[in-house]
Amino acid sequence: RLLYAPAVEPSDMPILAYLGVDVFDDLNVELRSATSWALDDGSWTKVDTKTKDLQSQNREELDRWLLKIRTSIMNGTLRELVEVTSLHNPRVSQILHHSTSLLIEKGARRNVMIRANNLSLENPSVVDYQQRLSDYVPPAKNMVLLVLPCSARKPYFKSSSHKRFYNTIKEVDNYLALHIVSVTSPLGLVPRELEFCYPAAHYDIAVTGDWSASEVQMLREQFSRLEPEKHYLKAIVHAGSSSKIITELLRERKVDTIDTEAEKPSSFAGLEILQEFTRTAIAEIPVLSSKDRAKGEAIGLAKFQYGESSPFLAESEISGHMPYKLRCGDLATISPRVGGLGLTLAGAAKYAANGGPSVTAEDFKLVGDLFAVGVKSYDGHWVIGDQV
């Protein structure tokens, strides 16, 4: 079925399309044209003289505006168009704010790139990620937290700067006891195990080095979800221009924190400083084996993805390591396409048996993907992008 909204203001069309409206009409354009208003990129401007062809001009402009909306839907940029229109339309801003919780329940397409700005702090996918960080646990107790800056390339570990960071710290004895967490806006904190997960691997933002008050508060809330004081013995902050803020937030939580004060973290001098501080910080930290580290990575990632239903993965035979070779027996394996642990058929069956969501298909031989028309019923709670 199609959802139709009559006489809608053009500036409201992007937000209504974002929320599921399918069909609009030109009644509003007809009424506005009769009273000497000209449409320009979704907004109205009063004209002094009544133009003979104003009605046809406005219809053409409406066609261009609707084409812009359709194109943004196809390109996955409708959210960004909505955010732009909300900057000068308080009604759109209000609707966008109140729709966040509804859209979190619905879920999000996992291949949509988020082009972030300050308004993205309320993007449903961003809020959902931030809330689920409460389910995540670091790989082991008594580790040293290493906070690094984000990178333009996603996932971060593929970037040249993060490769330099890793090559530097792996020369330190017991480097597996270091836990890398990257700091970024609008997500806040991204542990290394979650870099494949949506939307951590699917966003882009202009890096300025400045943090707004709302972003600082977001970081504070993310640290309260991560609870570093419970999991880490120490913290090293090597995040460039963000280091001062991160250090203050960690010390608020009574974490023994070292700020390397390196202005250019990935420079030769910055890497030397990083290696020196990490070597000193983990000198007396209990040795963490690669096997225990891998098991902890799998548990943390499984809890983030599957919440209360995750123990069935943690109880399997964990092998391999991040980022590409982690396996949970014959139940799941790390998958960049899925964005985390991808279930096998055996894993999916066990997931459903342990309270995971499932769908019942019509009686036919399945070849390829299962579409909505072939679904008979479903059980459990799931949103767009979840595995069932």
Report residues per predicted region.
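Short beta-strand/loop segments at the ligand-binding rim of alpha/beta enzyme cores
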Residues: R1-P6
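Alpha/beta catalytic cores of nucleotide-metabolism and tRNA/nucleoside-modifying enzymes
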Residues: P10-D128, P138-A140, R164
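Non-catalytic interaction/regulatory modules that flank or connect domains
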Residues: N111-L178
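Structural motif
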Residues: L148-A152, I236-S242
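Polybasic, low-complexity RNA-engagement segments
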Residues: R153-P155, K163, E276-V388
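Short connector loops at secondary-structure junctions
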Residues: Y175-H202
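Extended, charge-rich low-complexity interaction segments
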Residues: A201-I236, R279-P311
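Peripheral docking tails and interdomain loops at the edges
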Residues: S242-K291
